[in-house]
């Protein structure tokens, strides 16, 4: 039961950090490539 309570307290923290960093990454991509439907660094 103690491990389950530890899991319940760790999972929200990790998900908050993950989604926060993902949102920051998307914001920075949109800052350098605004309104890009196809990203220039993916085209060959």
Curated annotation (Swiss-Prot):
Keywords: Chloroplast, Membrane, Photosynthesis, Photosystem I, Plastid, Thylakoid, Transmembrane, Transmembrane helix. GO terms for cellular component: chloroplast thylakoid membrane; photosystem I. Coiled coil: none annotated. It is a single-pass membrane protein. InterPro entries: PSI_PsaJ, PSI_PsaJ_sf. The chain crosses the membrane at residues 7-27. GO terms for biological process: photosynthesis. The keyword Transmembrane helix applies. The keyword Membrane applies. HAMAP family: PSI_PsaJ (MF_00522). May help in the organization of the PsaE and PsaF subunits. PANTHER family: PHOTOSYSTEM I REACTION CENTER SUBUNIT IX (PTHR36082:SF2), PTHR36082. Belongs to the PsaJ family. This is Photosystem I reaction center subunit IX. The gene is psaJ.
């Amino acid at each position: 039961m103690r491990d389950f309570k530890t899991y319940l307290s760790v999972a929200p923290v990790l998900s908050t950090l993950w989604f926060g960093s993902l949102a920051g990454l998307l914001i920075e991509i949109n800052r350098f490539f605004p309104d890009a439907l196809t990203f220039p660094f993916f085209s060959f």
